[in-house]
Amino acid sequence: MFNLVEKRRWFFIISAFLIIPGVVAMIYSTATTGAPFRLSIDFVGGSIYDLAFAQPGITEGDIRDAFAEYDDRSLTVQRLTLDDGSERWSVRGSFLEQEQRDAIFDNLNEISPLDRERTQVESVSETIGSEVARAAFFAVLAASFIVSFFIIIAFRTVPNALRYGMSAIAAMVHDVLVVMGLASIMGLFFGWEVDALFLTAVLTVLAYSVQDSIVLFDRIRENIPQYLGEPYETIVNRSIWETIHRSLATQLNAFFIMAAILLFGGETIKQFIAILFIGLVSGTYSSIFTAVPLLVAWEKGELPFMSRIGAMLPAPRPTEDNGI
């Protein structure tokens, strides 16, 4: 049986290579734009106008003139040519009241009649955007605490139960950094924006990652009394091989579905599916090759800093119950 846990330092190096480019991209993006990635109006507020005109020949200058009285400094104007050859304009600006938007539409109609059936407007106030961003932060934070508490309680009969919870959180942090780094890199090079769907993808990735970690930890817990006398590292390696087929089978089902959506789905959800796809790959990797090797390294005293933290915290009282 190949000893995966023995190669844990290589797995940690691979994790570093996956995380560091994204962290660098987030630092660069923060230094240049003030945010680690391009934020949609869901988080910063504003308005997006999808404009369609009945007649061609509209220029960017015409559109800027129509907005000049109400929203000129923050305006971003982009011309889009659809597959059928029709022309649309995507305009992004600050949040405006309905009366101001109506006045802008009047200005645009004077230049060229708007196709009202194909013209769309999406607006989010800055207050709502900041509330969504705050809620997103607390949602991820709450998920981390709840998962840690659950694992500590569920594995209370295992020595050093806190280490299981902390290792699962480390895998979650790994996956969040991979997904956030991907969003930052794609935002810098391809203009991807982080919206409310991104938060959905992150929470979904965390759920899959935690599920895999718990399955592995549960098998370790079952094998510890069954293989008394074996080194802890050997028991953990055996547990990985006994559960790896289940982890891969579960994730492959999701991968095939997402791959089909990426190939044949609509453009509006492809970014969400791509983030989810990469996140689930990272979640599968981190559960097997980050959380469990980290647990072994901690148990073997290879993480003195983490050992000192664990010694400062009270250990849960063991019980006779081995169930979750």
Describe the role of every protein-language-model region.
Residues M1-I324:
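A structural signal for conserved, well-ordered secondary-structure elements
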